[in-house]
Amino acid sequence: QGPGMDLFHAVEQQIGAQNIMAEDLGYMTESVKKLLADSGFPGIKLLQFAFDSRDGGGTSYFPEDYPPNCVAYVGTHDNDTAVGWTTSAEPEDVKRAYDYLGVTDAADINWVMMRAIWNSRANLTIVLAQDLLGLGSESRMNKPSTVGSNWCWRAVEGCFTDALAAKVRGEMERFGRLDRPDKKV
């Protein structure tokens, strides 16, 4: 049993209110769920988790179920890239994703998945550079509980082009994600 909200109140007294997000992935006890609710901190939603057959693909991970007060990802540094996920995940999970997203193959799956979270009500979305670039498993950042090749991926000079920046800006305009000062995270 930790200090609960007393810890966050003490931190706020010392350094003021901060934008904090809670990593609420994995097993959550009722007391942790209550602490998250009491704190008002946004939790995390991972689109890849929506298709995970090992846990029934909880509906809370489908973008239409995201509350505004959350941070949405396709996957985090601990997951495979969107493109890599299509070959590393269970085939039935990939099929579920294709069916849900309305696609028949992995062509542009990174953009399709990013658009799904951008179209959600999540106040904040974060995408991996590797997903913006359409990279596969070879660029995965971290594989939890392993040693050796984690945290080695580096962007190469010139990979972030003006064309990519224009495409991202167009997507942000399309989904109303530019200059949203009214949105608190």
List where the protein language model places each region.
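Catalytic cores of glycan-processing enzymes that make or break glycosidic bonds
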Residues: 1-185
